[in-house]
Design a protein with these regions (language model features):
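Flexible, low-complexity linker and terminal segments
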Residues: 1-162
């Protein structure tokens, strides 16, 4: 099969289909199809989950970021380092399945996670759940229409390190 974007047109839909391939919107078909897909993804979570870590070893704070927020996070991290904070970065390349295992491991070694998001808290809830009280999960929200100010992220990182 060609990959999406490789020059071929194909129809993609959110419909569920029965075992014959025909669209079916019954509760039973929905449950069967969605459960199969979710279990398939969860079963391969270790091979699907992708993230890039930088300087997390020995860090007091880890910034967990994704998407465009990662670029601004990098600037905030640099500012915090200039103030003497030991801060690492975990940039999520794949958001789901979530990097639960690694967040759990890091939560036992760091004081806090700082999570900048251009919303009012989605991924921070996953970080908080996985940290399970071992480390704080601090949201740095942004309403949109732009990106975070690196100084605001620096302030959050410095505060989390105390």
């Amino acid at each position: 099969f060609a990959r999406a974007g490789d020059g071929y047109r194909f129809h993609t839909t959110g419909l569920t289909h029965d075992e014959r391939g025909y669209p079916a919107m019954t509760a039973e078909c929905q449950e069967t199809s969605i459960r199969r897909l979710v279990e398939k993804i969860r079963g391969e979570a270790d091979t699907i989950t992708r993230f890039v870590e930088t300087d997390t070893e020995g860090a007091d704070v880890v910034v967990v970021s994704y998407g465009i927020t990662s670029r601004v996070a990098r600037m905030g991290i640099d500012l915090a380092r200039k103030k003497g904070v030991k801060v690492g970065e975990m940039r999520l390349e794949v958001v789901w399945p979530f990097a639960e295992t690694r967040i759990r491991e890091l939560s036992k070694k760091v004081k806090a996670f700082v999570v900048p998001e251009i919303n009012y808290g989605q991924i921070v809830l996953e970080v908080e759940r996985c940290a399970a009280g071992n480390a704080a999960a601090i949201l740095v929200p942004h309403g949109g229409g732009g990106v975070h100010d690196p100084e605001d992220l620096c302030t959050a990182i410095v505060g989390a390190a105390k």
